[in-house]
Every structure is written in C-alpha cells, then in structure tokens.
Design a protein with these regions (language model features):
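Extended, compositionally biased accessory segments flanking or bridging domains
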Residues: 1-137
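Extended, non-transmembrane interaction/recognition domains
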Residues: 133-148
C-alpha cells in the first residue's frame, strides 16, 4: 500500500501545471482521500467534452445536473441524449500549501523550524524547513521538488 502523501506527489509530478484546474481522474483512485485531506478542492465541471464521431472525435457542450450527479450531451452520431456520471468531468484545484504542511508534520519538522518562504521555484521547488539531524544539535534543510 502506498502512502497518500507519495500518491499525491506522484500525481503532482505527472501534471504539466499546478495552478490550473485538473480533472479528477488525473489523481487516480485516491482522489477522494485527497479531497478529505483538503489537498484538492472542487473547482467546477467541464462545459464541453470530446465524444466519438465516426473515426474521430467532436467537441460537444454538456448539460450538468448537480442534483442528479450526472451530465448529458446530444450524441453527434445519432442525436440521442447520452447520460454519464458527473464525476467524469469534475475539476479540482490543488491546495499545495495544505499538502506541504501535512508532509512537514509527517516527517517531524517542528513548527518553529518550518520555512517562512516555502515556495522557492513556483510549481517546482519548495523549502519545508529545517529538520534536526538525529543525535546532534544540528539541522539540515528539507526541500521537495518535482520534475520540469
């Protein structure tokens, strides 16, 4: 079983940007856990989707029914209404600060040793703080980074 912190980091590492809304499926099967931990928050739904059309795809507008937890669109192939679960077009925003705070607590960085300037390179490098080196009075900086 993978740690939720590691699963979230892997999901972040596969995203092109962290400052844009993201489809729920990009977070994998753990996305509900990420919502509960407030690492991601709902940010609405897509208004258009790509659907099969002959040997290609076509963009169509969707009608969202939040109360019924579904969306629908008119199929360009046969004109019938297609109904799908709303989760398929749910968008989320990333709350990177919440995840970084939880990660700092997990690895045991004391509150007074947490960084006041966390973001070093936007969307790529963060300074969590200073971690005590075991058995000494020395501290080492702790950074987390993701690929370009």
């Amino acid at each position: 079983m993978t740690s939720p912190h590691l699963s979230f980091f892997c999901a972040l590492d596969n995203l092109p940007r962290l400052d844009a809304s993201v489809l729920a499926d990009r977070f994998g099967r753990d996305h509900q856990q990420f919502v509960q931990r407030r690492w991601i928050v709902p940010a609405g739904h897509l208004t258009h989707v790509m659907v099969p059309f002959l040997d290609s795809e076509q963009e169509v507008e969707v009608d969202v029914d939040v109360d019924a937890n579904r969306y629908s669109y008119c199929s360009p192939l046969n004109g019938r209404t297609v109904v799908q679960p709303l989760a398929g077009i749910a968008l989320y925003s990333i709350v990177i600060g919440s995840w970084l705070a939880d990660l700092s607590a997990l690895i045991g960085i004391e509150d007074r040793r947490r960084s006041s300037n966390i973001c070093r390179i936007p969307n790529h490098l963060w300074h969590l703080g200073e971690q005590r080196i075991a058995g000494t009075h020395n501290f080492a900086p702790v950074f987390i980074a993701r690929a370009w």
